[in-house]
Every structure is written in structure tokens, then in C-alpha cells.
Amino acid sequence: MELNIQTIPGYKTNQYLLVLNPHEELRNRIMQVKREFYDVYKAPTAIGGKPRVALITFTQFEMMEERIINRLKMVAMGYHPFKVELKDFGSFPSHTIFINITTKEPIRALVKEMKVAQRLMKLNDDFKPHFIDEPHLTIARKLLPWQYEQGWKEYSKKHFSARFIADSMLLLKRREGNRAYQIVQRFEFMNLPVITKQGELFM
């Protein structure tokens, strides 16, 4: 008899998402852009996803959560707050339209810092962590060809400008099959002299 690993106590898996979260006023502005896109192009993902900058996505056993939290806390303690500049729109042909992030390097450097924890985030060979190397803020994804073509024709000419200070990151999770994420923990960037060298992190 096959054993469903989801039914074993302590072996439940979650989908995790690590993000930068803009301040509330900016989130509301971006949600307005997403709603306007939905009103015209009827793309469900435009209103389904919240305005945030994804850093890492991964699937892992819930029993690993505490170790992952401790590792991310160490990285955040040693990282500095930084400015995130948003400017106009970009796209991933032929499925996604997003707001451009022009200050990519501090985000890429942060993601690189967290790669030292990738063993903790790897469930198995089929479920490896995905580190986002092209930071962006999604307006709509999984677009149909007509939605992308017509939407990009309009949004490639539109303008948007904003900035926010990233002073923390959020770890979110959801059960397989659930749509909504819940907050696991907020990690503040404290710019402290923390030892986070590779080889010392696989405790």
C-alpha cells in the first residue's frame, strides 16, 4: 500500500514564498494598476496576486520550517536596508507583464546571500528552491496570447514611477491546493556583523 506522505504527522509540505513587501500606500497604487488591467483584459492573476517582489519560492516539509527561519534570520541580520526603484513596465514574452525594478543589484545580492540555505529549502530532486534572478513586480502572469499582445501594446507605452525602502523581508506559506498565503515571519535587515559564510550554515 502506498503511503501518502502528506498524512504523516510532521511530514506535511508547504509552498513557501520569500518576498519584499512595499509600504501600504504603494501596495494600494499597484493594486489599482492591477485592477485596471483586469477590468480591460480579464486576467484573473491581475487581481489574484498581491503586490510584492518575489525573492525565492520553494516547497518543503513543515518540520524544516524552524531551521529555515533561523537561517533566514541570520542572513537578514547581516543585510542592510536598501532603496527599491520602480519605473514603467516590462514583460516576459508571452505570458507576463510587470513593473520594472531599476535597482536590481541589491536584490540580486540579497538572493545570492540566501543561496547558502538552499540545502534546507530543497525537498528532493523534483522540488528544488527557485531563486529569482530577474527581480520584478508582477501585474499579471499566465496571460493568454491575446491578453499579452494587447496588454503589452498598451502597457509598453504607459508610465509608472515609485520607490520604497526595503527594510525587511517576509516569509509566506500555503498548503498545497490553497490559494492564499499566510505570513510565517518578518525578518528585519539590521546590518549587523553576522558570520554567514558558506560551510558554517549547514548546521
For the regions a language model picked out, list residue spans one by one.
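Basic, often amphipathic N-terminal segments
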Residues: 1-83, 106-163, 180-203
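Short, basic/glycine-rich phosphate-binding loops at helix/coil junctions
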Residues: 90-96
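Short histidine-centered catalytic/ligand-binding loop motif
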Residues: 97-103
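Residue-level signal for short segments within beta-strands and strand-turn junctions
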Residues: 173-175
